[in-house]
Structure formats: structure tokens, C-alpha cells
Amino acid sequence: MLRDKLKLLQAQIEQERSKSNYRVNEVKEEFDKEIQKLRQQLQSLEDEKKFLVLESRGINAVNQRIKTSPPEAFSRVSSQHRALNTPDSSHIQEHIPKKRKTEISTQPSIVLNPNRVIKDEVSAFFDCLYVHRIVGVELSTIEILNCIKFEHIDEFNYKLLKINKDTSIGSGIVDFLQSCKKNMKLNELVDSVLEHLATLIKAIIINDQELNFSVPFLVALMVQTILFRPSAVSVNSLKDLFIFTCDLIRKFQIVLKKPLHKSPLEVDLGPQIFQYELIDNLILVYSFDLLESTTKVIRIQQLSETLYMEFFDESLMKSLEAVYKLTLTISFKPVINVIYSMVAVFVTITNIMNNDNLSKPFGSSKWWSDLLTRLYQLLGKRILNFHVFDDTNTNNMHIDRFFDFYSLLRNMGTNSVSPLLAQLVTRGEIKGIPNIVLKDDIIDKYESKKEKGVLSDNLELEKWFVYLKDDILSIIENLMGYFKKDSKITNGEILINLTKLISVEQSQFMDHLIDQDTDVFAVRMNLVEHALSIIYRMWKYYEENITQESIKEVESELVMSLWRIIVCKHASKKICKDDLMEHRILINQMENLHLQDTIDLYEDAFEDMPEYIKEELECSINNGTQQKMQVQYDDIYIEMARYILESKLTNFISVENTDSLYLSMGF
């Protein structure tokens, strides 16, 4: 069925492409005809003008000779005048070449198809860095750096970048960019900027007395540098940047080592200042953005297998292992911002391994098995939209209130902390110490939202958490595709953890999500279907790696989850159109409005809208309504669930339960 759908979709795409090509060719032919017609008209007008100029000059010459000639020459002049109209006249042969030599055309040239003027990429890169602004911050990044100076470093001097103690870091960077702008190509400039900024960050961090005030904004400029033109970054620079970022993350690992629960003996008697903690949080999150960006740029460049293996060598994988063990922690409080970036890094790396069919993996199967163990633990966390900011229960996914700022790559959260970044500096004043920011300012914001019962931000965060779990499923799927029957990767743990995931999500459907007019339901449905497809693939192709003990551990949950998927198809047949119309008004009102807009669009395009279009629109909106009522999955996933139950589970289920199961399946 999937192949038929794909073929039908490809045929529709090919038909649309042929229509668009025919339309483009037709417009181009009409345009060429108009141009040719205009050219012919211009040529005829120019010929007519030349003829009139020649004729007027000939007449003027004859009149001049008549005025200066003696009377006895009148007869000769008149004969010459008559000869002007004769093609064989010797007068024309004598004077016309001279007139053509002195003629100057005043007709302006018209460029019918001007060439596109390509903007100077180096200047565009300079402008991009100069106007870069972090989302939610009032000042640009360069403007913030213009207010920051060294506090204990007397002078920084590395190649082309020179910064004195009394001058701002931003002015030094701008001078450096302007000096490089004149005599460097884009790829040279990008590598040079990354090298100088990384060296500057190292100099600040190595000095124990120097504050890290400027480091997060320097890291933000590095992210913008490699994202401006990914193809301009060399592979060697990317590898150095990857290792540098891993070292930077390990330098600030203390931020990731917060205890799961607050000690009852701990008493907060000190001042509730937040500026130094905020700077460390920014450095950590932006460093993970830099790590994620570097990995994605490597994927975009589509290197050969040899270059991939040289990039992801043993030393780099060791650095990456140390970073993911800090991020996907079990003993400390998780930070969802950096976990998201870490998972995105592994999605990209496993895509390279699986889709490029590499002969050797990046790391052994044992290396990846240890990673999966930590991902399974993250996959088991519950997602509740009314607990997204509650960090007291670590079994639920949540975002720390003091990490609630947008990263450089995704806008996750409410971004309540980002406006405080502009308060760290004072305009028109250069300082090496940040201004005071209090924790109470952030706490008061969330208490106010809690009292007002704001839920929209929570729903957005809920979707982000579901997307995170879906990315983890993509990692599992990629590793299954690459390692195939390796029991360290493809084993019963996949069945156990994904079955629990489906069971928990289906419970969430019944407890909180059914009959809610929100698109979170569709996102969660896609997550369940993705998990089911992996279980189906595991069951069909790698069944020898599934032990009986693994099946027994989740037998009841698996049977119940699959039964809920299968029985939905039979339940949906009992709902008539009138009932669906009533349900649609109650629980699918936004889709109902979207349907009405689509109908209005078709009515504007057609005098009488075809019946098949009406039926398709009604069918799509009814399917969406049934999904929100949890009474319908896609047919392909229903068949997957049926296959699993029919093929193998009957060996582990009693006869009575088997009869009930077949009855519910429609047999």
C-alpha cells in the first residue's frame, strides 16, 4: 500500500512538473516573440531615420551649391539634383560614403535581459556578523561586545586580532573584520574568523582571574559564521572546531552537575544574584548549538567515506563520548536544552552512517549500545503539559526556569530569560563586570504566569518534547539499519522500551488528550506510529534477536497496545456522518475553519466545485476528527499491528485470550 501511495504521489508530482514546464516554455516563447517584434520595429525605425538623414543632408548640400555657383552652372546643378533620385547616379557614388563616415547614431542601447549582479559575499558576511542579534535581546551581539572589555588581561594580540585592556572587545573584532575584508576570499575569511575567535575564547578561559562575560556572545558569532555559508568552511576547520567545542563544554560541566534533589541541609542565605550563573548557562547552551551546527555542516558537505572516517576518528569519538555522558546524565538533573542538541548531533551522525552505507561505523557497536541505554532512559520520561516547568519530579520532561531562553538554532520555551541579556551591559559604558540580575525577577514572571493559568506556552513545549522522543526513535531506526543483526544494538531492549512508550502514550490519549482541539494530538499519534513501525521492522527482520524473556516482560502491554490500534478501525465504521459532524464542531473546530477556507478557495476557482473534491475534503476532516477521538490509525499501521499479533504472539497467549483477540480483530 505504501508503494502504491508513493507511486501515485510521484505520478501527481510528475504531472504537476510537466504542466509547469509546459507553462514556462509557453511564456518564454511569447516573451521571445515580443522581443523579436520589438527588435524589428526598432530596426525599421532606425533605417527610416538613416534614410531621412541622408536625404536631408543631400538636399542641404545641393541648396548650398546653388547659392555659391555662377548662373551658368544652374543647368548642371539641376541635372545633379535630378540625379539624386537615380540609383546609378555618379553623384551618389561620390558623396554617400563620406556622409556615412561622419554619421553618429544617437539611439540608446536597451538591455533586454540584464545579467544578475552578484553581491560581494565578503561584504555580506561582514554585514551578517555586524547586525547579528540573539532572539529576544534588544541589542545586537556586536553592540553588547562594544560594552565589554577585559578586566584582568592587559592585551590580546594574535595575528590580525589586537585588543587592548581599555578598548572594547567588540571594536577590536570589527577592526579585525574590516582589515580581513579587503584582501581575503570568503572561505579564507571564514576560517580566519573561527580561528581568531576560538583563540580569544581560550585566552579568556585559561586566565583564572578573567571573567567569562564576553564568551557566550563570541560563541554566538562563531555559530553565525559557520551557518552563513556552510560550504565555505573547510573540513580541517570543522574538525578543530568540533574538538574545541567539546573541550569548552567539559570546561563548564559544573553547570550540568546539579543534584536531582535539593538537600534539606542546604540553606540559601546568600544574595540571589543570577548574572554569573546566567553567563555560564549561556556558554553551555550556545556551545551545544555550535557542536550541532558543526555536525550538520559536515553532513551538508557530503564528504567521501575516507574523509568521514578521518573526521570521526578515535580521538574525536572519545571527546564526543565524554560530552554525551555529561549531557544524557542519570545521576544529575537533566538540562533539556542541551539534551535536544545532543540528540540532534546523533541523528545527523547516524544518518551519515546509515544513508551513506559506510563500510565501517563511527565507533564500535558497544559504543553505540552504551548510548542507547541512556536514550532509553530519556525515552521513558513522561510528557505532561501542566508540568513542563516543574523540576521537582525528574520522571517528567521539563525545562528549567533559569534555562528558559531560546538557543541559537531553535525557539524552544517562552524565552523569558533572554530580555535580561541586554541588562548585563550599560549602553555607552565599557565594563569588564556584568550588571546585577536577580533570580527573583525570573521567579516572579513564572509565578505570575502560573496564577493566570497560561497554557499556550506549555502546549508548545509539549510538542517540542514529543519531537525530541521522535528524534530518539530516528537514532534507533538508523542504528538498526546499519548494524542490522548485531545483538548489541538490535535486541529485546528495543521491543521493551518502545512497547512501554506506546502504552504510556495511549494512556495519555485517554486521560488528557481525547476531545481536545489541539495539534499536539496529531504529533503524539505520529510518535506512536513511528514506534510501531520500528517494532514491526524488528519483529519481521530481526526476530531471532528477540528472546522469550523480553516478550514476557511486556506481553500484556504489547497485546493491549496493538489491540487498541486494531480495534480502532472497527470502531470507526460505527460512527455515522451526522455524529462526526457534531464531534467535528466540538473537538476539531480549527480544522473545520480551515476546511471552510479551502472550500471558499475552490469556489473562487471553479464555478461549480466538483463532487470528488468535496468528498476528499470531507474525508480528510473526518479522519482528523476520528484521530482526535482515538478511533482511527492509518491503515498501514493497523496492518502492522495485525501482522505482529497474528504471526508470533499467539505462541505466548492462552487459548481463551487468543479467541478474544481474534474476535476483536474482526475474525
From Swiss-Prot:
<protein>
    <recommendedName>
        <fullName>DNA damage checkpoint protein LCD1</fullName>
    </recommendedName>
</protein>
<dbReference type="GO" id="GO:0005737">
    <property type="term" value="C:cytoplasm"/>
</dbReference>
<dbReference type="InterPro" id="IPR018622">
    <property type="entry name" value="DNA_damage_chkpnt_Lcd1"/>
</dbReference>
<dbReference type="Pfam" id="PF09798">
    <property type="entry name" value="LCD1"/>
</dbReference>
<keyword id="KW-0539">Nucleus</keyword>
<comment type="subunit">
    <text>Forms a complex with MEC1.</text>
</comment>
<keyword id="KW-0963">Cytoplasm</keyword>
<comment type="function">
    <text>Forms a complex with the serine/threonine kinase MEC1 which activates checkpoint signaling upon genotoxic stresses. The MEC1-LCD1 complex is recruited to DNA lesions in order to initiates the DNA repair by homologous recombination. Required for cell growth and meiotic recombination.</text>
</comment>
<keyword id="KW-0234">DNA repair</keyword>
<dbReference type="GO" id="GO:0006325">
    <property type="term" value="P:chromatin organization"/>
</dbReference>
<dbReference type="GO" id="GO:0005634">
    <property type="term" value="C:nucleus"/>
</dbReference>
<keyword id="KW-0597">Phosphoprotein</keyword>
<dbReference type="GO" id="GO:0000077">
    <property type="term" value="P:DNA damage checkpoint signaling"/>
</dbReference>
<keyword id="KW-0156">Chromatin regulator</keyword>
<feature type="coiled-coil region">
    <location>
        <begin position="28"/>
        <end position="55"/>
    </location>
</feature>
<dbReference type="GO" id="GO:0006281">
    <property type="term" value="P:DNA repair"/>
</dbReference>
<keyword id="KW-0175">Coiled coil</keyword>
<keyword id="KW-0227">DNA damage</keyword>
